[in-house]
Amino acid sequence: MRFKCFGSEETEQSSKIDKSIETDRRKLRKDVKLLLLGPGESGKSTIFKQMKIIQEDGGYSVEELLEYRAFVYSNCISQMEALLTASAKLNIELEVENKQRAANVLRRTIGNEPWLLLAADIKHLWEDKGIKETYAQKDKHFQLNDSAAYFFDNIDRYMREDFVPNEQDVLRCRVRTTGIQESEFTFDKIRLKIVDVGGQRSQRRKWIHCFDCVTAVIFVAAMSDYDQVLREDESVNRTRESLALFKEIVNCDYFKETPIVLFLNKKDLFKEKLKRVPLQSCFSDYTGPNKYKDAAMFIQSQYLAQGPSPRTIYTHATCAVDTENIKFVFRAVRQTILSQALEHF
């Protein structure tokens, strides 16, 4: 004998709920909102730009690339200005024939000084022994963008009248994020809405408005920043600041049920810096060898210790300017966040 547990009305209501859940599941498979968080200069905005490249039918049009030409010029000029200012503070002499070139760069006003003349001066200055000596002391005595050498090394290409920036130029261009960037991309048949918020302290109060309906949080931390200080507060170590910020995010009530993905970024720079700057100089409790694998595991453990136990935090070592690396990582992230998010339906 069969018993009816529900009347027709209850059965119909149950069916509607099941359909609603299935609709939500399908929508989740197609619509994913990712929140990119992290301190300033961690590489968040570079990853945001990578999404335009790795998405289906992605990449930058010639028109879009040309929009970055002025940013390329500006990055070259501002970074040489930083080197010249630092060389003066460090009492490092430039070669006699380059002193006028240095004056040209320092007194320039954007739009008034022809780019080709400034570029020629920058090219000669980058070959100056004094500038090379100054460059070797970056991070320790002054701040310089990670891609400064890349731009100087490519100055001949930038001096061509038919110069069109390539995707590496775009990825390496430093354009400070001062607000909220939001864009939609399609990656592996999933529609991603990615929100990138400025990481400087003054920008973080804006984050709260982005917390609704977030599928996952991607926190970007620069591993190579362990010996550097904040631009906005030179008394604060960048990695210490990043750890404190991650602790705040991972323990936030808004994200109790939200997957947290940690990108330990700039792994390439971290590997190179370890050859020059021991991790022990900034983390006295680190007792392992000054090798990439051991040091990276220590940095990872510092971040994982900020979260409540036994919460799972998905970690990936990344290089934001390496398109293939970011594509590989996002495929892993896609599977992880969808699997976990669907468990809650």
Swiss-Prot record:
Q: What does this protein do?
A: Guanine nucleotide-binding proteins (G proteins) are involved as modulators or transducers in various transmembrane signaling systems. G alpha-4 plays a role in morphogenesis of the multicellular structure.
Q: Which UniProt keywords apply?
A: GTP-binding, Magnesium, Metal-binding, Nucleotide-binding, Transducer
Write the gene name: gpaD
- List of residues binding Mg(2+): S45, T177
How does this protein assemble? G proteins are composed of 3 units; alpha, beta and gamma. The alpha chain contains the guanine nucleotide binding site.
Pfam families associated with the record: G-alpha (PF00503)
Q: Where is this region: G3 motif?
A: 192-201
Residue ranges of region G1 motif? Answer: 33-46
In its UniProt entry, what is this protein called? Guanine nucleotide-binding protein alpha-4 subunit
List GO molecular-function terms, semicolon-separated. Answer: G protein-coupled receptor binding; G-protein beta/gamma-subunit complex binding; GTP binding; GTPase activity; metal ion binding; mitogen-activated protein kinase binding; protein kinase activator activity; protein kinase regulator activity
| InterPro entries recorded | Gprotein_alpha_su (IPR001019), GproteinA_insert (IPR011025), P-loop_NTPase (IPR027417)
Which stretches of sequence are listed as region G2 motif?
Answer: 169-177
Q: Name one GO cellular component term.
A: heterotrimeric G-protein complex
Binding site residues for GTP: 38-45, 171-177, 196-200, 265-268, 320
Q: Where is the G-alpha domain?
A: 30-345
Q: Any coiled-coil ranges, and where?
A: none
Residue ranges for the region (G4 motif) are 261-268
